[in-house]
Amino acid sequence: MRALVLFCGTGSIDKAFQRLGWEVTSVDWESKYAPTHVANIMTWDYRQYAPGAFQFVWGSPCCTHFSRARTTGGPRDLEGATALVARTLEIMEYFGCPWALENPQTGLLKDQALMQGLPYSDVTYCAYGYPYKKKTRVWNTLGDKWNPRPVCCKASPCPPFSLEGVHPMSAQRGASKVKGQRRNGDNCSQAQLYSMPPQLCDEIAQAARDAVESRLPSQ
């Protein structure tokens, strides 16, 4: 099976699919991540691959301009950021296979018109072994093949929070005063902040495999 990973970044989801024996083709404009294609997704020629070439497509478009916490770095380019997401959805539609696209649940992407009506699941990273909460929305077409763990909340807290009433780290770099999100001055590294929990990635990869297999003709 083959997966296409758009905005591969640190390769969290790539590794999960590779652990299941999938061939992964990745795209990112940052050469430091060693993607298969170093390219801007807006100009990348995805039609070099035929429809059906991939059995799953994953997208992690940059969340910077969708972040409600953005206070530096110049004006917010919401139009440009939304165009990247539109291009991602265009590519997913072209290949006609199950797909998933993630972005912070607290961001502005979920309010954009192009996302309305798309199926999604919300997850929190702390439920998958990370020391901070980071509520994330995963739009996807995995249907009943993926049943994510409950979102961390007072009614269903993750283990670290239920034991101590606080998450050991914050999902923000630098100082934070968010209640329940930080302890003893700890904060996560940039590498970890830009990664996804392996447990979550493995769960999604397994669900993708199940979704693909359910589409195969019965023998």
Language-model features: where?
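Conserved active-site and SAM-binding loop architecture
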Residues: 1-219
